[in-house]
Amino acid sequence: MWKSILAIALGAALGALLRWFLGLKLNSLLPSIPPGTLLANLVGGYVIGAAIAYFAQAPGIAPEWRLLIITGFCGGLTTFSTFSAEVVSLLQEGRLGWAAGAIATHVSGSLLMTLLGLFSMNWMLGK
Protein backbone atom coordinates (compact mmCIF):
# COMPACT_ATOMS: atom_id res chain seq x y z
CA MET A 1 0.00 0.00 0.00
CA TRP A 2 2.79 2.44 0.89
CA LYS A 3 4.54 1.85 -2.43
CA SER A 4 1.32 2.75 -4.25
CA ILE A 5 0.81 5.89 -2.17
CA LEU A 6 4.42 6.97 -2.73
CA ALA A 7 4.17 6.33 -6.49
CA ILE A 8 0.99 8.41 -6.79
CA ALA A 9 2.36 11.21 -4.59
CA LEU A 10 5.66 11.43 -6.48
CA GLY A 11 3.94 11.39 -9.88
CA ALA A 12 1.38 13.98 -8.78
CA ALA A 13 4.08 16.29 -7.43
CA LEU A 14 6.06 16.10 -10.67
CA GLY A 15 2.96 16.65 -12.81
CA ALA A 16 1.78 19.59 -10.70
CA LEU A 17 5.22 21.20 -10.82
CA LEU A 18 5.28 20.90 -14.60
CA ARG A 19 1.77 22.37 -14.83
CA TRP A 20 2.78 25.27 -12.57
CA PHE A 21 5.91 25.91 -14.65
CA LEU A 22 3.97 25.86 -17.95
CA GLY A 23 1.41 28.28 -16.54
CA LEU A 24 4.09 30.55 -15.13
CA LYS A 25 6.01 30.73 -18.40
CA LEU A 26 3.20 30.66 -20.97
CA ASN A 27 -0.17 31.85 -19.64
CA SER A 28 0.65 35.53 -19.90
CA LEU A 29 1.33 35.17 -23.64
CA LEU A 30 -2.34 34.74 -24.52
CA PRO A 31 -4.64 35.37 -21.52
CA SER A 32 -7.85 34.61 -23.48
CA ILE A 33 -6.90 30.94 -23.87
CA PRO A 34 -3.87 30.53 -21.56
CA PRO A 35 -1.38 28.36 -23.48
CA GLY A 36 0.21 26.88 -20.35
CA THR A 37 -3.09 25.34 -19.27
CA LEU A 38 -3.79 24.12 -22.78
CA LEU A 39 -0.30 22.64 -23.18
CA ALA A 40 -0.58 20.88 -19.82
CA ASN A 41 -3.82 19.23 -20.93
CA LEU A 42 -2.47 18.31 -24.38
CA VAL A 43 0.77 16.86 -23.03
CA GLY A 44 -1.17 14.98 -20.35
CA GLY A 45 -3.48 13.57 -23.00
CA TYR A 46 -0.53 12.35 -25.06
CA VAL A 47 1.28 10.86 -22.06
CA ILE A 48 -1.79 9.00 -20.81
CA GLY A 49 -2.46 7.59 -24.28
CA ALA A 50 1.13 6.43 -24.66
CA ALA A 51 1.16 5.00 -21.14
CA ILE A 52 -2.08 3.06 -21.65
CA ALA A 53 -0.69 1.53 -24.85
CA TYR A 54 2.64 0.72 -23.23
CA PHE A 55 1.21 -0.86 -20.10
CA ALA A 56 -1.21 -2.93 -22.20
CA GLN A 57 1.81 -4.46 -23.96
CA ALA A 58 3.88 -4.89 -20.79
CA PRO A 59 1.60 -6.50 -18.20
CA GLY A 60 4.55 -7.67 -16.09
CA ILE A 61 5.57 -4.15 -15.06
CA ALA A 62 4.96 -3.35 -11.41
CA PRO A 63 1.57 -1.64 -10.93
CA GLU A 64 3.26 1.24 -9.10
CA TRP A 65 4.63 2.49 -12.44
CA ARG A 66 1.12 2.79 -13.83
CA LEU A 67 0.04 4.62 -10.66
CA LEU A 68 3.04 6.95 -10.86
CA ILE A 69 2.54 7.90 -14.52
CA ILE A 70 -1.22 7.71 -15.14
CA THR A 71 -2.80 8.44 -11.76
CA GLY A 72 -0.05 10.63 -10.33
CA PHE A 73 1.79 12.44 -13.13
CA CYS A 74 -1.10 12.84 -15.57
CA GLY A 75 -3.51 13.62 -12.74
CA GLY A 76 -1.19 16.32 -11.42
CA LEU A 77 -0.38 17.71 -14.86
CA THR A 78 -3.80 17.95 -16.44
CA THR A 79 -6.27 20.41 -15.06
CA PHE A 80 -9.99 20.38 -15.56
CA SER A 81 -10.58 22.80 -12.69
CA THR A 82 -8.27 25.52 -14.03
CA PHE A 83 -9.69 25.05 -17.52
CA SER A 84 -13.22 25.37 -16.09
CA ALA A 85 -12.32 28.53 -14.17
CA GLU A 86 -10.79 30.08 -17.28
CA VAL A 87 -13.90 29.30 -19.35
CA VAL A 88 -16.22 30.68 -16.66
CA SER A 89 -14.12 33.84 -16.53
CA LEU A 90 -14.51 34.26 -20.29
CA LEU A 91 -18.27 33.72 -19.99
CA GLN A 92 -18.52 36.29 -17.21
CA GLU A 93 -16.70 38.78 -19.43
CA GLY A 94 -19.22 38.11 -22.20
CA ARG A 95 -16.58 36.54 -24.44
CA LEU A 96 -18.74 33.66 -25.63
CA GLY A 97 -16.69 32.98 -28.76
CA TRP A 98 -13.46 32.71 -26.80
CA ALA A 99 -15.16 30.44 -24.26
CA ALA A 100 -16.49 28.16 -27.00
CA GLY A 101 -13.06 28.14 -28.64
CA ALA A 102 -11.38 27.23 -25.37
CA ILE A 103 -13.82 24.38 -24.77
CA ALA A 104 -13.41 23.04 -28.31
CA THR A 105 -9.63 23.36 -28.21
CA HIS A 106 -9.13 21.71 -24.82
CA VAL A 107 -11.59 18.85 -25.31
CA SER A 108 -10.88 17.96 -28.94
CA GLY A 109 -7.15 18.60 -28.54
CA SER A 110 -6.88 16.39 -25.45
CA LEU A 111 -8.82 13.57 -27.11
CA LEU A 112 -6.72 13.79 -30.27
CA MET A 113 -3.49 13.84 -28.26
CA THR A 114 -4.61 10.77 -26.30
CA LEU A 115 -5.26 8.94 -29.58
CA LEU A 116 -1.90 10.12 -30.92
CA GLY A 117 -0.22 8.80 -27.77
CA LEU A 118 -1.94 5.42 -28.18
CA PHE A 119 -1.12 5.14 -31.88
CA SER A 120 2.48 6.35 -31.59
CA MET A 121 3.30 4.01 -28.70
CA ASN A 122 1.72 1.06 -30.50
CA TRP A 123 3.72 1.99 -33.60
CA MET A 124 6.96 2.21 -31.58
CA LEU A 125 6.21 -1.17 -30.03
CA GLY A 126 5.47 -2.65 -33.45
CA LYS A 127 1.79 -3.34 -32.70
UniProtKB/Swiss-Prot annotation:
What is a single Pfam family found in this protein's UniProt entry? CRCB
Where is this protein localized, as stated in its record? Answer: Cell inner membrane
Reaction(s) catalysed by this chain, per the record, are:
fluoride(in) = fluoride(out)
Is-annotated flag, keyword Transmembrane helix? Answer: yes
Task: Look up and give the membrane topology term.
Answer: Multi-pass membrane protein
Does the entry feature the keyword Ligase, yes or no? Answer: no
Q: Which GO terms describe its biological process?
A: cellular detoxification of fluoride; fluoride transmembrane transport
> Its function?
Fluoride-specific ion channel. Important for reducing fluoride concentration in the cell, thus reducing its toxicity.
* PANTHER family for this protein: FLUORIDE EXPORT PROTEIN 1-RELATED (PTHR28259:SF1)
Q: What is this protein called?
A: Fluoride-specific ion channel FluC
